[in-house]
Structures are given as structure tokens and as C-alpha cells.
Amino acid sequence: MLLLANAPALWKLIDINSLLKTLIIILLALYTLVFMFKSHGRKGSHGKIRRLDSGAFVLGCGVLQSVIQLIIVIVLCFTKLNGWRLLANALCAYAITTLLCLSGIVRIAASARQVKILWYVIMLFTWYIPIVNCIMFRKFYKAARSEYYFEQAKLDLDAARKENEICKTKYPILMVHGIFFRDWQVINYWGRVPNELIRNGAEVYYGKQQSANKVSVSATEVAERIKEVIAETGAEKVNIIAHSKGGLDSRYAISHLGMDKYVATLTTINTPHYGCKFVDMLLGKIPESIQGFVDRKYNKLFTALGDKDPSFLDGVYDLTYKNCSELNASTPDSQLVSYRSVMSKMNSIRSAGFPLNIGYLLNKPYGKGNDGLVTVESGLYGENAKMIEHKGKRGISHGDVIDLFRENIKDFDVREFYVDIVKELKEQGF
């Protein structure tokens, strides 16, 4: 490819038959096209992982070629080539090297999840600017290569332990979502987690309650779903893993709706068991007219998206400190169910984007730490409570803990985190 990139200069410097030169250039052009579009991924890899590896390889070759080409340009300046020939050679080299890099970028864009959208925007406006584009190409290469190694390691790990079925629990797993979301088929609330559990032997089902409503209403829907799963699987009970308000819904169903005889374990993830005091503060300051306006718009939107009778305000009010205190007083834990809770926290306002970064600031006066929505004190519930300790400045947000952004976070593998939870359930006979 370097030969093709420097064809204008080599045409003048190499004294051979013109027809032979033309033939060589055609062959070099064909080779370059094949190289750009051929799969270069690791043997044994497949699908997006292979495309990601291939894209990183092609982009890496392009970046390396750009460095070598810079040296070649300097050397050519000391030859007998005239200015026009040097300019033509430089333009040819620039075009071929850029096409090579863009070929890698396209493959990465088709398969990578860890490349930031902002990078694509910057690339769109700077791909033709020398040096700047090289800096961006390098960023893409490092991100793609890092993601490839991480994902391939996950696949290798799953393959090595596949026969052990470490997540094959006695009872099926029921994953109950939090407020303002639904269990859509296209966009999974739990990100990459369910597939990871299934690959390791778990039987996974979803709560399918509405996006927002009173705890008592959502709990009724969760209770119906528990009965459906038991009827479908023939299992005696289910293991519930619930995030955010889903934990309150599940506790209500267990204690008030007779689901304790059908639930073996309840694991709550970042659930506001003792409420969100900043919600009390906001509701006390926002005029009722604005609250009503937001409620109507939200309910209309989510009715169109599949909810039967959503209620934004009812759901929000049941997250207040006052309502959660009343819920706790009237909802004792069942002796038939094994409870455990998990909580995380953000370490700075930069740990997450909007609206969790705003929630982080609003929550600061009410506890020693929070995840952007729930304080640590509110999320740790019962005797079997665990705090996720994350090294570094980032921390783990309310969204990170359910893989909302599908991001590979350094020192926190969210998929393996859930594998460990379910693995422990299996080891304990659940």
C-alpha cells in the first residue's frame, strides 16, 4: 500500500517499461482494495467481535502508514523530483492513507459500543485535516482494541465455564425494572446482563409492570407476573432481582399480596427503601400546575408506548421519604424469603451524565453518598446488605448498575457482577 501511495514519485524514479509500471499500479490498487474489505479478525471470533478486531487492525495499519509516509515525504524532498511531482505524490499518499483509515473506522462504527458519539462528531468535521485526523484515528484504534480484548475475554471465559452452568439456579430469575422504564424487546432495560446470565445457565424472565404507578399497583402487576412464570416453568418459586422502585414493588407483592410463598429470594439493586428526600424537596417547590402538566404528558406518551394506565405522579410520590416510611412500617419482611440488598455510589458529578449528575448534587445534603438518585443510606436494606466499592474517581451510578449505557467501566464488570449474584444464589440452594 505504501508503494501505491507513492506511485507518482516511484513512476519517475524507477526506470522500467511504462506498460509494466501501469500493470504494477493496477495490481497494487487491487491488493489495497482487497486489504480494505477483507476480514482480518482473529480466527474463532465471530460477528461484531470479528468486525471490531478487523476494523482496529485496518485502522492501525492506516495510522502506521501515515507515520511512515511522513518520513517518506521528507526523504523525497531531497531527491531530483520537481515540486509538482512531489505535490501529486503527497496528495496520492494522503488520499490512500485516509481511505485506509476510514475503512477501519466504518468497521469499528458498525460493531463498537465503547466509542463515544462525540468522537464520531469530531471525526465528521476533522477527518480531512492532517495531524488532527491522526489523533482521532489513534483514539478510535485504542478504544476499539480495548473493547475487542475485553469482549473476547468475556467470550473465552463463558466458553471455559459453559459446562459448569454456574448461573443455573433451582428457581428461575425474575428481573424487575425500576421507574420510568418498560421491558421492551428492542431495548433491554438490563443491557447486556440477561444474555450473560443465560449463557451461564440462568433462566431469565422480566417483571413487565408498567413504567410508573403506585407501588401497590405495580406490585399487583409483579404478582401476576410471578404467577405466570411459575405456571410457565413449573417451578415452585422464583428468585427476584429488582432495581430501583422495582425493589419496593417486589417487597409489597411479597408482604401484602401473598407472594412470599412463591418467592425464594429478593435481591434489590439501588432501591430507595427509605425514600428519596430530594424528591420530597422538589415536590414541595414545584407548583402543582407544572406537576400536573408533566404527569399528563408522561402518561399520554407511555400509554402510546404500551402502558395501560400509567401515573407519573403516583409513582414519584411513592419514592418520597414520607411514603417509603409508611411503606416500611406496614410491610414487614417475610420469614419465607431470603432478602439481600446492593448499593453503589457516584464519586463525583462527572461520574454520569444528565439527569443523574443533577440528582447527585440534589442528593448530597441527604446522605454520605448517592448514585444520582438514591442515597447509600436508603439503598442498604436489611442484614444482608452489600456496598459496591469502586476504585478511582468515577464510581457507579444508578444507570451503570443495570448496564444502562452498555459501557465497559474500568474495575467494574457489570455483567460479571450479576453472574456473581446469581452464582451465589445457586450455591445457597436457590
Descriptions of predicted regions:
Residues 136, 183-184, 250-252, 276, ...:
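Generic hydrophobic alpha-helical membrane-span motif
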Residues 165-237:
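Active-site catalytic motif of lipid deacylating hydrolases and related acyltransferases
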Residues 4-20, 177, 204, 220-324, ...:
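Serine-dependent carboxylesterase/thioesterase catalytic core
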Residues 165-166, 230, 258-259, 331-334:
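Structural motif
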Residues 181, 212, 246, 274, ...:
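Surface-exposed, flexible loop/turn segments at secondary-structure boundaries
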Residues 37, 44-88, 262, 268-430:
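Helical cap/lid subdomain of alpha/beta-hydrolase-fold lipid enzymes
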Residues 1-186:
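Flexible, membrane-associating and regulatory peripheral segments of lipid-active enzymes
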